[in-house]
Design a protein with these regions (language model features):
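Alpha/beta-hydrolase active-site loop
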Residues: 111-136
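Primarily recognizes the serine-hydrolase "nucleophile elbow" in alpha/beta-hydrolase
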Residues: 129-194
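Cap/lid segment of the alpha/beta-hydrolase catalytic domain
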Residues: 72, 98-119
Length: 309
């Protein structure tokens, strides 16, 4: 059973991601993460973070961005640092956190304590607690979060453990694993605290793990006509969901890692280059830049693509 469940959200090592210019020095610290061996929050894990350019954004303190990597993804791999550099460039103390993401069996009972370990507002040794204690952080301005695959689950659950989490951008996740017919009710909208108009999720149409419109709608809270590729909040704040079509990325296959130029059209693969329609300066509604711009407004304003895509 473990070997089957491992396939749900396994992310391989990213190679040669065409990252944006790195801004600033990467600093490190540690926090106490959830330890499945003791069922307690006593597993020392690492945090890496960058500060904004003080010439542009002032001396701080700054609002906080937190990125959670996917299964088997390391917290400082090129994908994680792409997010960190981009959010530091938007005026955030931008951090990426390691957690126990190597365990094969992944269910709500394992996801929820991992998320609590990262975001818990009541524990000074959580990742959020450590970051918010920094003289460079002002968490009263707000925390925003993002993550891919299992990391997307962490981000969606974040506000359940920390009311300072104001907006979330999640990638490649839903409430149902197609390959093993496993449901994740913990991330369904009735069970999450984050308002639906502060959540954006972008998935690939050919994702063999978390694909499908209904499982995505269950997490988002927004429902559109069957066959829709995008669905946005009626209040115009830019929250909602997007399903990237196979024709929209360079490789012609929008799998679990649609944001990478994956060799061989393998929907399971997460090894490759950053897809040019996802990386900056691409400005589609599913591209990285516009979604991080939306996140930087704490989920209140989106600049929609003039192409409609």
């Amino acid at each position: 059973m473990k070997s089957v469940l491992w396939l749900i959200v396994s992310l391989s090592v990213y190679c040669s991601l065409q990252a944006a210019e790195r801004r600033g020095t990467t600093l490190t610290t540690t926090y106490q993460s959830y330890n499945p061996n003791t069922d307690n929050f006593n597993l020392t894990q690492s945090i890496a973070y960058q500060l904004p350019n003080s010439s542009r954004f002032g001396p701080g303190p700054y609002p906080v961005f937190m990125y959670a990597p996917g299964t088997y993804e390391t917290y400082t791999d090129p994908l994680a640092m792409e997010f960190v550099a981009a959010m530091a460039a938007r005026g955030f103390l931008a951090a990426t956190v390691q957690y126990d993401n190597n365990e094969a069996v992944q269910t709500c009972s394992t996801y929820t304590p991992r998320a609590q370990g990262i975001y818990d507002v009541n524990r000074s040794t959580s990742a959020a607690g450590v970051l918010c204690s920094s003289p460079y952080a002002n968490c009263t301005k707000g925390i925003v979060s993002s993550g891919v695959s299992q990391g997307g689950f962490m981000a969606v659950l974040a506000a359940n453990y920390n009311p300072k989490v104001k907006a979330v951008f999640a990638l490649s996740m839903s409430d149902y694993a197609l390959n093993v017919s496993l449901s994740y009710p913990c991330v369904d909208k009735p069970n999450t605290v984050l308002p639906e108009n502060r959540l954006t999720i972008v998935n690939g149409a050919a994702d063999p793990f978390f694909g499908g419109q209904q499982p995505l709608e269950n997490v988002s809270g927004y429902t559109c006509a069957n066959g829709s590729s995008q669905c946005w909040s009626p209040d115009g704040d830019g929250a909602g969901w997007y399903i990237v079509q196979n024709s929209q990325n360079k490789n012609g296959y929008a799998g679990h890692c649609y944001f990478l130029d994956v060799a061989g059209n393998d929907p399971n693969s997460c090894v490759g280059l950053g897809d040019p329609s996802w990386l900056p300066p691409a400005d589609y509604n599913w591209s990285l830049g516009p979604n991080l711009d939306w996140l930087a407004t704490f989920g209140t304003k989106r600049n929609f693509s003039s192409s409609g895509q």
